[in-house]
Structures are given as structure tokens and as C-alpha cells.
């Protein structure tokens, strides 16, 4: 008998969920790789994954489910899932997924009524230390609940966790509207602004990360030093190193069936460093995929005794980890790449040039969105293929914006971001900066940089990007454009969280200080 296993569902996000039912076409084979597929090439569609029960009796049930509306169809798949729970998750300000398990009945009620989450999710840092400087929540408010609502379009199941259903969620304010400081809602706000001008922001993300043969207990026992990398030596693009860790590589391939399709996966320069390229998609879907990739890579790695780290610069003498973003605007109506103009010597349209001009102009004051931690700025140093100036060039990896001529795939590579970013925030801010340039028809006055860009600021030809989180945060706090495009409440909250972050760092006595001063001063 044919086995029905729904491994990938492609849903057009511009359609209502009711249209979800009509998007199905089925295939069957004996390898449980049946695909329910709506135009894979449509960047307005996205993939999420789930499974239908394999019992033969369910063939008729599936035929009946076609008659259901989309919400009922998803709920039906939840009901026949073998898992008693559904997992829901949402992003905090640092890009960490916070969530919990719900039983099926509780999840079903949350679709209509929403559910409560303690507001401390936006009231503490990545170490769960409570902020003392944010307005949204704290002792002064009593840490009340805030609302949350699962986004049904993000439905997938977790292959390495007994196919537990998973949904991403948006946080909701007391007025029932999107919470202004929710990173995912902030990205939606920027996307809406783009759509108002008939621009569809699309992008693909790349991540580099370190892998160690460690776990959280061994990290503490070793005091975070003398860590054992998954493989020794530098060896970028090494087939030998990937084959030596083929079990881990094959486990990461499970992300394909999880709705996080990888275009490429290889070793990068550095001991135990890997890089993955996530398939191009719409801005929101790209952000969903990116945050799930980071979280789930950690889960998959831990099951094999590996600790995956997306810290931007773990060690001063080794390369940092990037989170590059490949971006362009498509026409919202036709899907045409609006960055391409083949009559231009660099194949750059006027829209593309203004987009780049906007990003270059706003990069210094928007920098905390792209370099959000103390450690981020240890990566942004000369000579390590990370930019230190607001510059652009054609296929130049020393600049902030690398322009890639690729016909219909013509795009920019935003190289400032490290792997420590919150994808929702970095994508929102980068497209907001580009959109500002396009709306205001900014002229791209800076010439493309040829060769080494690192010496330019030393010669006074361009400005140096801020060197610390403290410096960049104070620039951001004064940015009227950031508040206009991302929302004043979001920017004010984000600024205070970054002030808290560098204040915590400044209060510490570091090993370097002890080694330098303890004996000799």
C-alpha cells in the first residue's frame, strides 16, 4: 500500500490559510519521501514539514481532510501525531528561542485565544539576569503576562525529536496588536513598509560556527579554556574533515526535511569550523529558517556529544564566525529582480545603487543591530575578512557590501553581521536601511573599492566603524531613522538592553587585567 508521509508543505504566505488546502499535490513512493509541493521556485512560498500517520486506514482520512479548512487540516495532523505535545517557540531580543511544550488541547485553544507568557522574556538577558533599565517589564510592573500566538504557517515536525510538532509564535501586546518590541513583529513591520512600495525583500543567510567535542558541564569544568575542537587545524573546504565527521554532517542534512533547506555545507578555516548556506527565500521565511538553523544545529550537535557555538569570535588568534546576508528586492507583482540592470557596467539598477547608499549611510548608527554583543567587535578587526568600514565593492570580501553580478541572481552580500546576530533584527534593520536609501533616492557617491579596504580609514578616506558596543549603541540611541523605520519603542528597548550588556562587561575583572597588573603594578 502507498505510504503517505508529508515531508514538505509549501504555502504561499500571501494567501489566507484557507487556501492552504488547495496547495496540495501528492506523490508516493516506498521510501517515505512523499512531497506535497507548491511551486518550489516561488520565493513567496516556504516549506514547513510534518508527517501523516502511516497506517493504511489514514488514506481515506487524508482524502476527507482536503475538504477541511486549513486550520482544521493542521489540527487534524496534530491530533494524529504520536507526540502528546506540541512545541512552541519565539525569539527574545538576543535571538534565543524561548518556548515550551503544550498538550494538544491547550495548543488548539491557543490558536483562537492566544496564550500567556511571562513578560520576563523581554526583561532579562541571555543569561537570564533581569534588566534594571527597561520600561517594558521589571519589578516596577511585577512581570505580568504578555500575549503570544502561534503562527500556523510555520508548522513543521522535528525529525530528531520523535516528530514533535513545532510552531513559531509572535508576541502580542495587551491591546491585541503585535508587541512593538517583538523581533519577529519588527521584521514584519519593515516588510510591510517594503510592500507598500511594491518591493518584496528576499534573502539567503550563511552561518559559520565552531564545533567542540564538549558539553555544558565540560565547559564549566574547563573554565571555558583548552576546549577540544571537533577537528584540528584550519582546513577550509576540506573533504577529509567532513568525511571524518560524516555522521554529524548527515545529521545536519535532516534540516532539509525540517523546512530549513541547506544549499551548501562545508568546513571553514579554523579548527572545527563549519559553514552552511541556507536557501534564498522571502525575508520573513529566511529569518525563520535562520533562527531555527542556529537553534536546531545546537540540538543536533548535542545529541552527538558536540557543542556548536555561534559566538562571533571565540579566540583572538583564530577567525571569527560570520552571518552573511545575501539580499535583493524583487518586484512584489512580477517577482522580477529589481537590482539588475544589464545596461549598467556593474549590472546595478538605480534602485540597487540607492539601496547600497542607504545601507552605507546608516551602517555606523545601525551597527548594534548587526553586532549586538561585546564579542561582536572582536570579529570586526582588520585582516580577518570582516569589514571595518562602510564600503562596497564588486566581489570584494574586504568591504561591508560585496556586490555579486549574477544575472537574475544579482544581489548584495551584507558582510558585517556575525553569527551571533538575532536574524529577525539584522534582516529588519538591513532592509530598512536599504529601503530608506531607495525611498529618498540616495546617490551612490562612493566608488567601488578595489582590493584592500582596511587601509582606507587609516588614510582618512572613509570613516572607521565604531569599535565597541558602547560606542555604537550611543550612536543608535540618537538615530531618528531607526525609530521611524523600526519603531521608537523597539529601538528604545533594544538600546537599553545593549547598555545593560556593556555595563555588565565593564563591571567584570578579566583575566587579561590580572595577568597584566596583579603582580607588577
From Swiss-Prot:
One of its GO terms (biological process) is glutamine biosynthetic process. Its EC number is 6.3.1.2. Residues 76-176 form the GS beta-grasp domain. Keywords: ATP-binding, Ligase, Nucleotide-binding. SMART domains: Gln-synt_C (SM01230). Residues 183-521 form the GS catalytic domain. It catalyses: L-glutamate + NH4(+) + ATP = L-glutamine + ADP + phosphate + H(+). GO terms for molecular function: ATP binding; glutamine synthetase activity. It comes from the Eukaryota. Pfam families: Gln-synt_C (PF00120). Belongs to the glutamine synthetase family. This is Type-1 glutamine synthetase 2. The lineage of its organism: Eukaryota, Amoebozoa, Evosea, Eumycetozoa, Dictyostelia. The gene is glnA2.
